A protein has these predicted regions:
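Acidic, metal/ion-coordinating pockets
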Residues: 2-350, 409-416, 428, 472, ...
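Catalytic centers of hydrolytic enzymes
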Residues: 15-28, 32, 36-40, 44-48, ...
Length: 618
């Protein structure tokens, strides 16, 4: 067993003290998260075939592991929409058609998953069908399902997580789960029991319009209370170690759970934030930045350590999204279930050939056929829509924190589409969270270049194809909306704004976030105005119109007409907070708008030439 480390502390990471009692049990946790549609291998690595091979190898190393998914198992994407014959082998003469993405998820060897916000994007009926077809069960401790298609899948009590596929509880949703690390007969476990609970974001209905018949806690305290009830139940059932799958949009929000008093949890697997926790010297996605925690944590960033209010150490782990990495955490515990240290070999494993060799992992030929068949099914989407000679930037860590050329191009497309039907629309505003990928090619030496834009590129980058709408509102309401879009600016929020040409948006990194009250998953009222928006200018019929200057709305009652997408107009991502606005539909969608723009070389050049739209100030 590893030697317990010395107590450490920094200004941001409080002291963590491990038990010095003898270690009597080891938890081997294998985890992924935010895989969305990332089932196909790319030039650098990744893909479901490699992922399944690595997970299998890690399970064999461990002897008895717990394999979990931290949410967002899918997202609206071509890989989900197309169908291929499966199983693709000669032993099945008449294979059924199946979504390759769902087949991929069932091939990973998961014991359990938590539903993420994107799992709801296509509605509860679709998610219910996905869960029914899953080879593993789901856990959602803070999700109250009051009706709708998911209600029939709810398992009121705890479920056991077994190695059989499909699992006995496959296709069910439970508030908590247990896994026996020894031999089990019925509910009797000869060994340590690991409990699994799960949290969804309090903002679930802001993040996904498909969540209609579910309720979530209104705030962090409510989430802590819901989790505590399941922790207490697990402890009463003889559980020794508790793992929390948290899809609350990133590890900093999970720190907040501990600060709010969550106790009894030993490990938190963070999802929804795609925190790239990669220690120095370990391989990761080429060209991608590691999480800042990896340079600030005294005990390293895999895992990150925090202390609960009862003094117990809590390990937090996460992986980047898109099925590029599999995490493997091994922790030792004393007889009281308190962590004594991290076992050697705990690390994130980047899914490349070097990892396969190091782990002696064997890739399943059937999963290689799955990837090949998926590529064949996607081939008709290689229709070229237009030529763009520069890389269009849609990487999450960039587009959610700053202006990017792809964000600007999509906003300009919305404006063009809206103005065809409503000529007096002056600007377009959109969120960054709906931009899911870049468009371009990465050369072997890491350069990012432009390429012909295909239909597949479009469907991969803009996966939701929301309707284009026109919103009429006051200058004060627009300023409040941009304040809502700037909440958490700099921390990778999907609500972060991208704007059309002619807009000048200056925001303060040090400004105060807007505070709101939620009701039934939507912003009911603004409790405290934000102070991030410094300046906002939009085009006008006779020249630029200054809406906000120095943080002050100059003409609050004046009216303006803007283009956006229906998801935001309906209050998604917290936009248009507590407002009743005039929404005028158009016949266009995001895809149609983008296709029209990218087919016009002059319009593309003009759009890409206009930069400096969104400016960060101190």
């Amino acid at each position: 067993m590893s030697t317990p480390p010395t107590t450490h502390a920094t200004a941001t990471a409080p002291a963590v003290t491990f038990s010095t009692a003898p270690s009597v049990a080891t938890l081997h946790l294998v985890h992924v998260g935010d895989t969305e549609a990332g089932m196909l291998a790319e030039e650098h690595g990744g893909g479901v075939a490699r992922a399944a091979a690595v997970i299998t190898a890690l399970r064999q190393r461990a002897g008895k592991a717990v394999v979990v998914h931290a949410g967002d198992t899918l997202i609206p994407a071509p890989e989900l929409a197309v169908e291929i014959p499966w199983p693709a082998d000669q032993a099945t003469p008449k294979p059924k058609l199946a979504s390759p993405l769902l087949v991929a998820n069932n091939s990973l060897g998961l014991h359990v998953a938590v539903p993420g916000n994107h799992d709801f994007d296509l509605g509860e009926a679709f998610l219910a069908d996905v869960i029914k077809k899953s080879s593993f069960p789901w856990v959602a401790s803070t999700l109250r399902i009051g009706g709708g298609p998911l209600a029939a899948l709810v398992e009121p009590g705890p479920i056991w997580l077994d190695d059989t596929a499909p699992a006995p509880a496959a296709g069910r949703i439970a508030p908590r789960a247990r896994r026996c690390l020894g031999e089990r007969q019925g509910d009797r476990c000869d060994g340590v029991v690991v409990g699994v609970i799960a949290a969804v974001p309090e903002s679930l209905r802001l993040l996904s319009a498909g969540a209609q018949h579910v309720e979530v806690p209104a705030d962090v305290d409510g989430t802590v209370a819901a989790l505590k009830a399941q922790v207490d139940a697990l402890r009463a059932e003889g559980t020794g170690i508790v793992v929390l799958l948290s899809h609350r949009q990133g590890i900093t929000r999970d720190f907040a759970l501990l600060q709010a008093g969550l106790v009894g949890v030993d490990v938190i697997v963070s999802g929804g934030g795609e925190n790239r926790l990669v220690p120095t010297g370990q391989r990761h996605l080429p060209g991608a930045a590691v999480d800042p925690l990896c340079t600030s944590e005294p005990l390293g960033c895999y895992p990150v350590w925090r202390t609960a209010r009862d003094g117990a150490p809590v390990a937090l782990v996460a992986t980047d999204g898109g099925l590029h990495t599999v995490g493997a955490l091994s922790l030792s515990f004393d007889a009281a279930g308190v962590a004594t240290g991290v076992e050697p070999g705990s690390r994130p494993w980047f899914l490349d050939e070097e990892t396969l060799l190091e782990l002696r992992a064997e890739v399943d030929r059937g999963l290689l056929r799955l990837e090949l068949g998926t590529r064949d099914a996607l081939a008709p989407l290689q229709e070229v829509l237009g030529e763009v000679d520069v890389w269009l930037e849609g990487r999450r860590e960039l587009v959610r924190n700053q202006e990017t050329n792809l964000g600007s191009l999509t906003a300009d497309a919305l404006l063009r589409a809206a103005q065809r039907h409503q000529p007096d629309v002056v600007a377009a505003f959109r969120n960054s969270g709906a931009i899911r990928d870049s468009i371009g090619v990465v050369t072997p030496d890491g350069r990012r270049l432009g390429k012909p834009v295909t239909l597949l590129d479009l469907k991969s980058a803009l996966r939701f194809d929301s309707a284009v709408v026109v919103v009429e509102l006051s200058h004060a309401a627009l300023a409040a909306t941009i304040e809502a879009a700037l909440v958490g600016a700099g921390t990778g929020q999907g609500r972060f704004p991208q704007v059309s040409a002619g807009v000048e948006l200056v925001f303060s990194r040090s400004g105060r976030d807007q505070q709101v009250r939620l009701e039934e998953g939507r912003v009911k009222e603004i409790l405290e105005p934000g102070t991030r928006l410094v300046r906002l200018v939009v085009p006008g019929p006779t020249g630029p119109v200054v809406i906000v200057d120095g943080g002050v709305v100059l003409a609050p009652a004046a009216r303006v007409r803007i283009a956006t997408i229906d998801y935001l107009a309906g209050g998604g991502d917290g936009w248009f907070p507590g407002q009743t606005v005039v929404v005028v539909p158009t016949p266009s969608t995001e895809h149609a708008a983008f296709r029209a723009l990218v087919a016009d070389p002059a319009a593309v050049r003009q759009s890409l030439a206009v930069t400096g739209r969104v400016i960060a100030a101190p």
